[in-house]
Amino acid sequence: MLSIINLTSKTIKEVNKGVDLVIGFFDGIHKGHAKLFKQSDRFNLLTFDHIPKKQRLLYPKVDEIEQLSALSGLEQLLVYDLLNNNLSAQEFIDNYIKLIQPKRIIVGSDFKFGSDQVDYSLFAKNGYEVVVVKKDHCSTSEIKKLIINCDLDQANKLLLTPFYLKGTVIKNAQRGRTIGFVTANIILDNQLIELTEGSYVCKVIVDNKTYQGICFIGKPKTFDEKQRQCEAHIFDFDQDIYGKKIKVELYQFIRPTVKFNSINELKEAIENDKKAALSFFHKQEKPKVVVALSGGVDSAVCAYLLQQQGYDVVAAFMQNWDKDLNFELLSDHADDQIQGCDAKQDYEDTQKLCEQLKIKLYHFNFVEQYWNDVFLKVLEDYKKGLTPNPDVLCNQFGKFGWFINALRKQFGDDIKIAFGHYAKLITKDDEVFLVHTKDHNKDQTYFLTMLKKEQLKNIIFPLSELDKPTVREIAKQANLYVANKKDSTGICFIGERNFKQFLSNYLAIKKGPIILIDENKKIGEHDGLYFYTIGQSRRLHVGGTKEKIFVCDKDYNNNTLYVCYESSKDQYLSSVSCELEKFNWLIDTKDQLFNKKLWIRFRHRQKLQECEIVSYHDDKVIVKYTKQIGVTPGQYGVIYDQNLWVVGGGKITKIIK
């Protein structure tokens, strides 16, 4: 516990010996003082009372002591009273410093002491190690000038806490109540700096609760009173606080004092003061944003950038998979080790990142919803012979479904929500549009194509103008906890798995023949049709063929996998048109897009291909394109206009060769 010692020849024996000693005049703790305190993690502090110079103070000595008492690392606070005891600098060293025996003496570069006002070099001449800290033009005298000249914004930037007045609320004539503006009045100490008389934007702290308000400082000329005081009108406040101590923080000067000719003039002026204060607070309030953190570097950089932009950032993490609850028995992590996306590790990384950035973290569990709305749909597509895309479903039903609904319920419908997707949103005529980003390799609009416009309301994509190398560099420069973490791969929210083992938990897997369609002969055995994708050429485990082979068809009725030679890909794998089912339009002018040159992508990172919409009916769209290899049913076709705004997308159901 901090001990406070009024330093005299008798009490000096109570001072701890051999610790650092910070010496200074601490009337209002500012950033220059903070530099002094950072020089040691264990120190005593020596300050002075009753400075001989006739100068007004920022705060009473009791407030100075209260502020200093909160310092980390401070062991003893020594107060030396200069009244009738102002020794020369050398006498002070001989009578006090030599008895204190400090390890080091820490002072500011402008420090002078003693009746002869000698600088800090005298300590060194007496054999003490002196640490001199430059305060960069941050001084109490400069802060006083700023406050007197009504530049409270700059003064508060230099102070560690906003400039304030304190006092006990007094009884008065209660004339404010008669005109609808109740005030809490405190008497101002005449020893403190004399503020410019007038109206100020303020905050009032009552019983450790903070309220917005306005205050008048001066001798109220309106009613011919002479006592200098602070009259604070607290917004939306009707408690009886007479006799209570309050703190009034000053933020902005509104207008000088004037004499009003009538009550109505006074009321109008106060109303205008209140409007000015409310406008000030509205501009000062940090907009709140929830960042969806995944444990990866992209979302971490989102949180960091939004903090740097002045947002009030909170974080949310959602768990969508539980290995035990979901009966995942057979699947080991890929390569027999945890890599990339692992729910437990990701949550731990997210917690450590939030501790580093000092932001609050909320945890949401959507294991049941993920199973029903995403995973069962994935299994259903596999059973139909399709190649599903879990990432599209994750965004459609998960991140921008149950997740944002839960966040809006928690924080309000207008809460801004940020994601680490490489995507861009443009608002035009109060409508939001999804747009391709500058990083063509990383762009993730493909995975967002099934989102409705209402799902994109108040969504922020902070990485929209950045590429991946830049994001990595930002993370490293900011020393973010996950800066060197690998990108996640594998199944959305499930992570790296031995895919064959994993899928075997939920689907009946049966081996069968691999038929080379060019020669109509069996060349091997597949491990189960679900494990293969149209156009796949790797991991077929078939050797001895004269050419590279590709998966070209899957016959679920006969459990047969068909492959073809590379030279016959055009015959078996090419297409010039396809049908997109449950097409989600993100641009309303679809009639104007009919038979117009557009762009399409059938898989993430694929180079954009020319196309045109040849017909649409209900939720089905037929699209024609330049010849493509490996367009796969179950995946999605995403269409862009000439400006790379997303027109919409749908699931590929039919291929037209």
Swiss-Prot record:
EC number assigned by the record: 2.7.7.2, 2.7.1.26, 2.8.1.13
Disulfide bonds: 394-492
Enzymatic class: transferase
Annotated localization: Cytoplasm
Gene Ontology biological process terms from the UniProt entry: FAD biosynthetic process; FMN biosynthetic process; riboflavin biosynthetic process; tRNA wobble position uridine thiolation
Region (Riboflavin kinase): 158-282
UniProt site positions, description: Interaction with tRNA: 421, 635
Gene3D superfamilies: Adenine nucleotide alpha hydrolases-like domains, HUPs, Riboflavin kinase-like, Translation factors
Keywords for the protein's UniProt record, in alphabetical order: ATP-binding, Cytoplasm, Disulfide bond, FAD, Flavoprotein, FMN, Kinase, Multifunctional enzyme, Nucleotide-binding, Nucleotidyltransferase, RNA-binding, Transferase, tRNA processing, tRNA-binding
GO CC annotation: cytoplasm
Residue span of region Interaction with tRNA: 442-444
The keyword Acetylation is assigned to this record: no
Region FMN adenylyltransferase, residue ranges: 1-141
Active-site annotation: 394, 492
Region tRNA-specific 2-thiouridylase MnmA, residue ranges: 283-657
Interaction with target base in tRNA, as annotated region: 389-391
Catalytic activity, reaction form: riboflavin + ATP = FMN + ADP + H(+); FMN + ATP + H(+) = FAD + diphosphate; S-sulfanyl-L-cysteinyl-[protein] + uridine(34) in tRNA + AH2 + ATP = 2-thiouridine(34) in tRNA + L-cysteinyl-[protein] + A + AMP + diphosphate + H(+)
GO MF annotations in UniProt: ATP binding; FMN adenylyltransferase activity; riboflavin kinase activity; tRNA binding; tRNA-uridine 2-sulfurtransferase activity
UniProt pathway: Cofactor biosynthesis; FAD biosynthesis; FAD from FMN: step 1/1; Cofactor biosynthesis; FMN biosynthesis; FMN from riboflavin (ATP route): step 1/1
Keyword flag Nucleotidyltransferase: yes
Job description of the protein: Involved in FAD and FMN biosynthesis.
Family membership: In the N-terminal section; belongs to the RibF family.
Descriptive protein name: Trifunctional protein RibF/MnmA
Gene this protein is translated from: ribF/mnmA
